[in-house]
């Protein structure tokens, strides 16, 4: 039986960038990584220099055209093979993912890219964000973005952005795993 101080105790031994907010009892065979049915990531971008956001968000100087970027996001939701956004040297051979939603949002003076999928490839979100920023800068047209996804070739996609703005924000599991 876990006592009332369990969350406090576990958080006291976890690294500073990880925290437990709650817990649920699950079946013995439940697997936190492979049992999830969806995951949501947020990539944070700020445009005003702020030392408190350093190493927590991407500082981006250009103007962000949310409408244009969200047009490109529609391509992600209607696609299923994301080899173009995967690491090149990888041992996996299945690049299929089901994107539930992908969108850019304004949050106060900052921006968030929010994406949910049944699974993600290694480096996928950071590569997608880098490529979407190239669409924003008009280095890549919407038509070219669509071709990048269709061609399944990492060389066509934009650069990966830094990991410092990437956050796993939500994981969903089937109700059958809970006790």
List each model region and its residues:
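Structured-RNA-binding interfaces characteristic of tRNA pseudouridine synthases
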Residues: 1-179
């Amino acid at each position: 039986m876990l006592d009332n101080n369990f969350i406090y105790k576990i958080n006291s031994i976890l690294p500073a960038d990880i925290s437990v907010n709650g817990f649920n009892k699950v079946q013995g065979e439940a697997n936190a990584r492979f049992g999830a049915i969806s995951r949501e990531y947020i990539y944070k971008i700020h445009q005003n220099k702020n030392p408190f956001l350093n190493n927590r968000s991407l500082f981006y100087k250009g103007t962000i055209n949310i409408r244009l970027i969200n047009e490109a996001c529609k391509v992600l939701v209607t696609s299923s093979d994301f080899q173009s956004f995967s690491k090149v040297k990888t041992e996996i051979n299945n690049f299929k993912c089901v994107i539930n939603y992908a969108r850019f949002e304004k949050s106060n003076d900052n921006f968030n890219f929010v994406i949910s999928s049944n699974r993600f490839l290694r480096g996928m979100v950071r590569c997608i964000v880098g490529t979407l920023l190239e669409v924003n800068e008009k280095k890549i047209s919407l038509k070219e973005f669509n071709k990048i996804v269709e061609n399944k070739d990492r060389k066509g996609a934009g650069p990966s952005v830094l990991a410092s703005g990437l956050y796993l924000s939500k994981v969903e599991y089937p109700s059958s795993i809970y006790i």
